Amino acid sequence: MTSVQPVPRLVEQFERGLDAPICLTWELTYACNLACVHCLSSSGKRDPRELSTQQCKDIIDELERMQVFYVNIGGGEPTVRSDFWELVDYATAHHVGVKFSTNGVRITPEVAAKLAASDYVDVQISLDGANAEVNDAVRGKGSFDMAVRALENLSNAGFTDAKISVVVTRQNVDQLDEFAALAARYGATLRITRLRPSGRGADVWDDLHPTAEQQRQLYDWLVAKGDRVLTGDSFFHLSGLGAPGALAGLNLCGAGRVVCLIDPVGDVYACPFAIHDKFLAGNILSDGGFQNVWQHSELFRELREPQSAGACASCGHFDACRGGCMAAKFFTGLPLDGPDPECVEGWGAPALEKERVKPKPSGDHSRGTKQGPVALKLLTKPPARFCNESPV
């Protein structure tokens, strides 16, 4: 009699890696009309090596063959590419759904009407404050009004279930109820994500990331009111604050297993928050296409191997938090097999106080001079926008 092999649990299948990513982030351009102080890709200027329209279409063809359901398109500000809408139409016509993140600069009433007529496009508007004072201190003067105008245009056009994407910071964690109300006003869904010390975020992380008390506040809010709030894998490092399973979301680092990132020049990174040579798996143009990189790169094979708990092996919360975020540890100069810098047991804080060597960024696409670290209190004057002309 042939024995039936048990089907691995879903998380076990994820840990071993899938034939195609569940969540593929594609940064179409580094060009951006804003200069957000925490931008994970240090965007601003367009890279002259940026993939052409045809090269992008070739990648979409490959994603269709791999049966990738959808891509998260970002940047930079993806809508400043002159071929952006052409690429969106091409993707949806080839069975690849599109979710794109935007600051709202190009979401006019006409564009909103076009988006409302599509069944395969999702729109995510970035906001980091529930009012202009908080938001514009991080994203630039006028960015709050621009984002709200985009939400109004989408709502008026009948676009259903847009997303409002919020990076939780020390300054906006008290506004979670206000963000939820803003989403309800425009028939949108609230999505909140963790601040990572990546890109320009490395310069401001010490001043912007929530305190330990605010982490508890965030956790309690998510447990009490977060049923309809999207978080992805942002806050699995907080799982140890309560009962197992109390916090919704994926308690797993999916880097190279179920997620990855394609950058504007075709480089493939293990994680959207880890744009650094250490996490570079290959290049679509020079390494035989995306499928070859995803399925055969040495880095991805290593990430799919069973991982040691390292310094967290004796912690009773390890099965819940899995040691936290790889990118957060790497960009704060902490060992990858050690505690998360925001470890709820408090092990991250003393690790951060020790001498550390923070990795230098692999690339910086900022326009002009980098803004310095922000003050602990709100800035009295929003940072000036670096770029008032077309960044393309």
Curated annotation (Swiss-Prot):
Q: What Enzyme Commission number(s) appear in the record?
A: 4.1.99.26, 1.3.98.7
Q: Where is composition skewed (Basic and acidic residues) in this entry?
A: 354-367
**Magnesium: is it a keyword of this entry?**
no
Q: Per UniProt, where does [4Fe-4S] cluster 2 bind?
A: 253, 260, 271, 325
The protein's matches in CDD domains, at most eight in alphabetical order, are given as: Radical_SAM, SPASM_MftC-like
What are the boundaries of the signal sequence?
A: none
Q: What happens when the gene is disrupted?
A: Cells lacking this gene lose the ability to utilize ethanol as the sole growth substrate. Glycosylated mycofactocins are not detected in this mutant.
- Which is a Pfam family this sequence falls into? SPASM
Q: Which residues are involved in binding [4Fe-4S] cluster 1?
A: 32, 36, 39
Query: Which residues take part in binding [4Fe-4S] cluster 3?
Result: 312, 315, 321, 343
What task does this protein carry out?
Radical S-adenosylmethionine (SAM) enzyme responsible for the first step of the biosynthesis of the enzyme cofactor mycofactocin (MFT). Catalyzes two reactions at the C-terminus of the mycofactocin precursor (the MftA peptide). The first one is the oxidative decarboxylation of the C-terminal L-tyrosine of MftA, forming an unsaturated tyramine moiety. The second reaction is the cross-linking of the tyramine with the penultimate L-valine residue, forming a five-membered lactam ring. Its activity requires the presence of the MftB chaperone.
Record family assignment: Belongs to the radical SAM superfamily. MftC family.
* Entry protein name: Mycofactocin maturase MftC
The taxonomic lineage of its organism, from the top, reads: Bacteria, Bacillati, Actinomycetota, Actinomycetes, Mycobacteriales
Q: Which gene encodes it?
A: mftC
